[in-house]
Amino acid sequence: MEKLILAIIVGCGGFIGAALRYLISENTSKMFNGNFPYGTLIVNIVGAIIIGFIMDINANTSLISGHTKLFLTTGMMGGLTTFSTFSYETINLINCGNILMGCTNAALNLGLSLVGVIIGQALGKIVY
């Protein structure tokens, strides 16, 4: 029964994260014209910052329960960030002849997401 409860916790977080990803991507595409997938880049960076922050706080304090951590990281951030969409968009850009834009997308998503985790961890150390 405990596994089912944990799966429901992850699913609820995933629903919220996926809904946020949809809203961010839709609004971002309206703000920026062009072919570059800014929405995916934004959710991956924001998600990296948030997961770095949560994991650092969890490692250094007891402020976040195991269930809350699971809801926020595996659920919400798992639904918000998206490696599969990023991968598809990158290959699609390359296949459409936008090799530079595809490589830029890959470099920005990877590099800035890694930096995002570092920022999140630093924020966790500052806050707690």
UniProtKB/Swiss-Prot annotation:
Q: How is its activity regulated?
A: Na(+) is not transported, but it plays an essential structural role and its presence is essential for fluoride channel function.
Name assigned to this protein: Fluoride-specific ion channel FluC
Q: Does the keyword Cell division apply?
A: no
Q: Where does this protein hold Na(+)?
A: G78, T81
Role noted for this protein: Fluoride-specific ion channel. Important for reducing fluoride concentration in the cell, thus reducing its toxicity.
Membrane topology note: Multi-pass membrane protein
Task: List, in alphabetical order, the Gene Ontology terms for molecular function in this entry.
Answer: fluoride channel activity; metal ion binding
* Any Pfam family: CRCB
Family named by the database record:
Belongs to the fluoride channel Fluc/FEX (TC 1.A.43) family.
Origin organism is Clostridium novyi (strain NT)
Which reaction(s) does its UniProt entry say it catalyses? fluoride(in) = fluoride(out)
Task: Report the subcellular localization.
Answer: Cell membrane
HAMAP family linked: FluC (MF_00454)
The record's keywords, sorted A to Z, are:
Cell membrane, Ion channel, Ion transport, Membrane, Metal-binding, Sodium, Transmembrane, Transmembrane helix, Transport
Indicate whether Membrane appears among the record's keywords: yes
Tell me where the transmembrane regions lie: 4-24, 37-57, 63-83, 99-119
Report the InterPro entries cross-referenced here.
FluC, Multihaem_cyt_sf
Q: What is the lineage of its organism?
A: Bacteria, Bacillati, Bacillota, Clostridia, Eubacteriales
Q: Which GO terms describe its cellular component?
A: plasma membrane
A GO biological process of this protein is: cellular detoxification of fluoride
